[in-house]
Curated annotation (Swiss-Prot):
Protein's name according to its UniProt entry: Ribosome-binding factor A
Family statement drawn from the similarity comment of this UniProt entry: Belongs to the RbfA family.
Xref: SUPFAM superfamilies: Ribosome-binding factor A, RbfA
Gene name, Swiss-Prot/TrEMBL: rbfA
Pfam families: RBFA
Length: 123
């Protein structure tokens, strides 16, 4: 694994820990997952993809809460991870988990319909 990937994974772990144990913002949903962190090669910026299970309002509130806590999170990362530069953090909403769950649901429904509509003469 190359250095940038290792740093991205370490930052991902630390941000997850900070969100779970340090942030007390009531806007944050209980079901926030950090799905991916992409750090630029110069280590100046980190794009953090978060998945929030809940309504659109809960997603928007959670994203706002994370954005307002970005400075605190950056400071904590600076204390926990030894880097020359602590990356500036940008949060982005990631809907891939919900899309995956929706596609799985569609596949299951289609599969159930196909089983129910099988003609006994076809077997």
């Amino acid at each position: 694994m190359e250095r940038i990937e290792r740093i991205s994974e370490e930052i991902k772990r630390e941000i997850s820990d900070i969100i779970q144990n340090e942030l007390k913002d009531p806007r944050l949903s209980k079901l926030i997952s950090i799905t991916e962190v992409n750090v630029t090669k110069d280590l100046r910026y980190a794009k953090v993809y978060v998945s929030v299970m809940g309504s659109e309002e809960e997603k928007a509130n959670s994203l706002e809460g994370l954005k307002s806590a970005a400075g605190f999170i950056r400071r904590e990362i600076g204390r926990r991870v030894q880097l020359r530069y602590t990356p500036e953090i940008h949060f982005e909403l990631d809907n891939s988990i919900e899309r995956g769950a929706y596609i799985t649901k569609l596949i299951n429904e289609t599969s159930a319909q196909n089983k129910g509509s099988k003609d006994p003469e076809d077997t």
